[in-house]
Amino acid sequence: MEHPIPAGPLAVRWVGYELEPPQAGALGRARVVFDNAGSASWRGLNVSYHWLDDRGNPIVWDGLRFEVHAEPGERVDRELDVRGPIPPGRYRLAFDLVDEQRFWLAELGNFTPELDVDVAPRDASAARTFLPPDAELDPDWQERVNAAHTDGYSAVGGSIDVRRRAEELEPYAPNGGRNPAFAHPLVCPSLLPPLEPNIEVAGLPAWRPEGDEPWIYDARIRLRL
């Protein structure tokens, strides 16, 4: 891979990269190979990535981080976890090195390799729903759940229409649409492996968001109890 290399203490020469076919929202693998082409040792640098649209605008700027150490002239061969962007579609994937809270090496004039990537819908075939026996689902409940999973969400929850008032379930009243900032656990969720319910709300199985697993609450996904 031929590209210009800036003079200075922090410079990188990209040698190559490989990427597993990504799915929206799912963890995949990549492999990057690069050299420390500068005069300074690398300490406290991380290799990461950006997901961009076709005009170079950031969709996901802060990818997962992986620490790298290298002396001047040393080669790094590193496997990375890469989480696919949401929703599926055509993106650009850019790799870069970052000195946290200071700068990305691209800001110092370093080359950033970019590749055009088709991000596939997420495989939702293994999704599991956690519902009580007396739950009545709206006719489009399963269709909406599947659509959210294939968009890339590991955990999907919706609204609950209760026959008897239950204070704990008031935040789940059926109104609105998708809410990525929903402040409560997902009750009676649909989860992709390896996720499992990790809490109960009003005696019902629920999942409280944890880690970086993508999730969505959609009030249009409605069930009755």
Give short role names for the model-derived ranges:
Residues A11-W14, N46-F66, G109:
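Short beta-strand and strand-turn-strand segments in soluble, beta-rich domains
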Residues P174-P194, N198-P205, G211-L225:
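A recurrent flexible, glycine/aromatic-enriched loop bordering the glycosyltransferase active site
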Residues Q101-T112:
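Beta-sandwich strand segments
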Residues D140-P171:
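Conserved donor NDP-sugar-binding/catalytic core segment of glycosyltransferases
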Residues E2-A24, E114:
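Low-complexity, acidic Ser/Thr/Pro/Gly-rich terminal tails and inter-domain linkers that flank the onset
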Residues A126-E136:
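Short beta-strand-to-loop acidic/aromatic patch adjacent to the donor-nucleotide binding site
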Residues R83-G89:
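Short, surface-exposed loop/turn segments at beta-strand-coil junctions that are enriched for proline
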Residues F34-G38:
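Asparagine-centered strand-capping/turn motif at beta-strand->loop junctions
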